[in-house]
Amino acid sequence: MAFLKKSLFLVLFLGIVSLSICEEEKREGEEEEKQEEENEELSEEELRERRAWLDKLKSIGKVVGKVAIGVAKNLLNPQ
C-alpha cells in the first residue's frame, strides 16, 4: 500500500510541475506578444514622425529652390 501511495504522490507531483512549466511558458508567450505589439505601435509612431519631418523638409526645399531661382534670375538678368 505504501508503494502505491508513493507512486501516486510522484505522479501528482510530476503533473503539477509540468502544469506549472506550461503555465510559465504561456505567460512568457503572452509577454512576447505584448512586446511585439508595443514595437509595432512604436514603429507606427516613428513612421508618422518621419513622414512629418519629410514633409517639413520638402516644404523647406521648395522655398529654398524658389529663392535660388529668384537669385539666379536676378544675377543673370540684372535690370
Swiss-Prot record:
Keyword Thylakoid: no
Localization: Secreted
Signal peptide boundaries: 1-22
A single BP term in Gene Ontology: defense response to bacterium
Listed transmembrane segments: none
Similarity comment text for this entry: Belongs to the frog skin active peptide (FSAP) family. Dermaseptin subfamily.
UniProt-recorded name of the protein: Raniseptin-3
Native species: Boana raniceps (Chaco tree frog)
